[in-house]
Amino acid sequence: SYNSGQPMQAACLLYNITGEQQYLNEAQQIARSAYSKWFTLYDSKELGEKFYRINGDHAWFYSVLFRGFLELYKIDGRRDYVTAFEKSMLQAWMSECRNQTTNLLSNNYFIGKTNSSWQVLHEGAFVEMLARLAVLELEGK
């Protein structure tokens, strides 16, 4: 996932700098491949809907992927990748994976397990993704 996010973000930045279509095409191809590989259709009882969600690996890897999807969204306006992240984060927050006392999110954020200890790197990644989503919301995007 992070191995897709970083080159996708780089391709977007190169497109912004050069305007060369090949970089945008590359970013879009990486996005399609990453989405196909790292997202799964999920039926959420918490949200009452089906959506494509992150497969549930370590959040830091997905935060890097999310950066790439955000850069691409700024260029092509395709929101389905961002929406998948948005719903994935909402699912994690609304489910049993969130510790109701501390609001920390479990490493197992789609299977509903809670932890007795947490990793700073993991929690930081969640904060980053949630903050980036909040900025989009404030901007009306």
Description of each model-found segment:
Residues 22-141:
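CBM-like carbohydrate-recognition segments
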Residues 14-19:
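Inter-helical turn/loop segments and adjacent helix faces that build the functional surface
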Residues 1-10, 59-63:
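Structured, solvent-exposed acidic/aromatic patches
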Residues 10-13, 68:
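"A position-specific structural signal for the A-helix of alpha-solenoid helical repeats
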